Amino acid sequence: MKTHRETLGHWLLQRITAAFLIPTILIANVSTLILLNILLFWHIHVGIEEILADYVHHEVTRNWILILLRVFCLIIIKYVFVFFVF
């Protein structure tokens, strides 16, 4: 069971990443593209992690899904970066 502090930390992390996404979309260059890419997938990852924590009750299944989610996000970040830079 999550403590109040962990829940508050996830809530703040979702709001902070969402707030940083807006200015990085408006500024268009390579460094902000990298930051946008990382922030976007980090925001997606935190959101899906919260959904899994709420609705997947079997711990082993949840851990495997989280591992696969991290691998998926890393692969997609790489492909998006390569698509926009090269």
Curated annotation (Swiss-Prot):
* Disulphide connectivity of cysteines: none
One of the GO BP terms on file: tricarboxylic acid cycle
Q: Mainly localized where?
A: mitochondrion
Where is this gene product found?
Mitochondrion
SUPFAM superfamilies membership: Fumarate reductase respiratory complex transmembrane subunits
What is any one of the record's Gene Ontology cellular component terms? respiratory chain complex II (succinate dehydrogenase)
Which superkingdom heads the taxonomic lineage of this protein's source? Answer: Eukaryota
Tell me if Mitochondrion is a UniProt keyword of this record. yes
State the signal peptide span. none
Which terms are listed as keywords in the entry?
A: Mitochondrion
Stored PANTHER family: SUCCINATE DEHYDROGENASE SUBUNIT 4, MITOCHONDRIAL
- What name appears for this protein in its UniProt entry? Uncharacterized mitochondrial protein ymf17
Species source reads Marchantia polymorpha (Common liverwort)
